[in-house]
Amino acid sequence: MEIPPVQQTPVSMSMNHSSYPVRCLHPTSHTQHESAFSTAAPHSRPLGYPFSMNPMANHPGHPYGNPYSTAAVTPVSESRLGGFSDDDNERLYHFSRTDKSPDPTDQRINGKGKKMRKPRTIYTSFQLQQLNRRFQRTQYLALPERAELAAQLGLTQTQVKIWFQNRRSKYKKLMKQGGAPPPAVGTPNSSAPNPVQQQSGQPGHASPPGAPTDLSDQQMSHGGQPNLPPRAPSQGQPQNGDDDAAWAAATCHDQRRTNADLLPTRMGRQQYQSHGELHELSPLLPLSMALPGTAAAIPTTPNIERQQQYVLPPVNFLQRL
């Protein structure tokens, strides 16, 4: 007798699979089950049960089923979906398969299988000019300022933010490599005249009468003789700034001055008069260097002619002293 076992099998199946909503919505007859079980006979398991013990494991239409077990999906779709219409089978089949491939538009993979970087933003010269100008004013932008600048330049706020981040990094890197800019060299003593320049007689630094001078600070040239300033042309004497030593020697020989010609003044300087001109002689300069026949240079000031002319007393008065 083969009929009783066939009648008991659908009853047990209906009891075991009564929890499926698909089976409840689509009732089938016993003849359909018989045809379905007859086709699934080669795939029968022990005890004549063609399915696994877990009713949710290989169900193609169940959302918790295994979508990757293609070997089990094929016989189940032939056995379980045999009584459904073609539209239901196609709908359940597509519902069971889940496509795990990402969207082709989101793929940024090059030929080596690595993720490609986003394309670099190319800024125009006008945009770079405005961005640099704003960076000079402030290195950090608030949200309203960033939105306003982005709308003004036709950029997104993200592009403006990234540009400022890169610019700050570059600025910090330059400051770390080059260090802080050197402080401006102050010139607090630039207004005070240099005593060496005063003694050398440079224009604009004339030494006042009676100011202390130090010949040791002067640069000696021409065999130990102090530098002489260019003398103003007077009485046919040649003017040559490079030949100061020859000019000093010629002046000493022409004047033929004596010790009586020297006159101490109140300002602590010694003055001598020659050819109607008044000259000053530093008290630190030895008198032997000022005598005729010596090649000593006598420091003078360039504006000596503008100074007040002192009237010397008669020679007889000097001899009495």
UniProtKB/Swiss-Prot annotation:
Gene3D superfamilies listed in its UniProt record: Homeodomain-like
Superkingdom assignment: Eukaryota
UniProt keyword terms in alphabetical order: Developmental protein, DNA-binding, Homeobox, Nucleus
Chain intervals with Basic and acidic residues compositional bias: 90-106
GO cellular component, one term: nucleus
Any single GO BP term: regulation of transcription by RNA polymerase II
InterPro entries per UniProt: Distal-less_Homeobox_TF, HD, HD_metazoa, Homeobox_CS, Homeodomain-like_sf, HTH_motif
Ranges where the record places region Disordered: 79-118, 173-244
Example of a GO MF term: RNA polymerase II cis-regulatory region sequence-specific DNA binding
Keyword Nucleus: yes
Annotated PROSITE patterns: HOMEOBOX_1, HOMEOBOX_2
Xref: SMART domains: HOX (SM00389)
Keyword Lipid biosynthesis: no
Polar residues bias: start-end ranges: 187-202, 215-224
Subcellular locations according to the entry: Nucleus
Pfam family, one: Homeodomain
DNA-binding region: 116-175
Membership in a protein family: Belongs to the distal-less homeobox family.
Name of this chain's protein: Homeobox protein DLL homolog
Lineage of producing organism: Eukaryota, Metazoa, Chordata, Cephalochordata, Leptocardii
